[in-house]
C-alpha cells in the first residue's frame, strides 16, 4: 500500500499485544503507520466510570498505560463502538457525579488527558460537545444541546485543545519518544492527582499537564525540572468551558522555587485539569 499509494495512511485496529505492527524497520513490521490504542481507551474509560471514592485504587490503570505507550505508533481512539448498544455516550459514562455539571467537569478532564497523552487523537462525532444520547445511525446529532452553556463549554475546550495541538510542537512532534514524557510525583497521598510533562524537540519546550480526579479541591506542590515560570494555558474549570473559575484565575503565572529541586504549587479544583506552558 505504501509503495503504490505513498500519501495514504494505514491504521490497524488490533486489540492484542501482537508486536511490530508499526515498527519502521523493513521486514520486522506489518508496515502500518499507526495502531489503535485500544488498551488505553479501555483503561481510561474504566477509570472515568469509577466513582470518585474508589478512584485512588484505580489510578494505576492510567499509570500503567505508560508501560506500553511507546511500543508502537499509537492513536488514542474514542470511536462509535463506545457510544452505542447501551454503552452510554461519553458524558453519561462519567462517574464523577450525578448532575450534568459534574459529568461535564469529568469529561473536560478526560479531553485534556486525551489531547495531552502522547499519540494521535480520534473523537467520534457528538462527543466534542457532550451529546447525551447514544449515537444512532438513523438520527441527527443533538445539536440543540449547544444552546446550553455546559455543551458550549465542552465544544470550546475541544476547539482550544485542537489549536494548541496544531500550533505547539510540544504535543505533536515527540509522540514516539519515551524520553519526552515523564510522570511527576506519583507518590500523591490522596490517590486522585496525576501530572506529567511533555517535552518538545527544542530546549525549553515543556508543558505540564495536571489533573485532580477527586471530588474535592486540592493544593499540590509538584517537582519540576526547570527554574522559571509556568503560565496556565488551559484550566478546564474556567467559565469559558462551563466551569466556575473566573478568567483571571485561569491566566496566572506560577513561579518556581529558586533552587533545585524546583517546584510549583497548583490549586486544583475538583474534577479538573490544567495545561501549563514553561516560560524561561
What do these predicted ranges mean?
Residues 1-136, 166, 172, 176, ...:
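Conserved alpha/beta catalytic core and glycan-binding cleft of carbohydrate-active enzymes
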Residues 97-101, 145-152:
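A short acidic, glycine-rich active-site loop
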Residues 104, 151, 220, 261-262:
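A generic helix-loop boundary/linker signal
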Residues 105-109, 149-157:
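Generic recognition of stable, solvent-exposed alpha-helical segments in well-folded globular domains
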Residues 135-145:
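Active-site His/acidic residue clusters
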Residues 146, 153-154, 161-163, 222-255:
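C-terminal accessory region downstream of the catalytic core in glycan-modifying enzymes
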Residues 148-153, 162, 166-172, 275-280:
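Beta-rich accessory regions
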Residues 247-280:
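C-terminal beta-strand-rich structural cap/linker in extracellular carbohydrate-active enzymes
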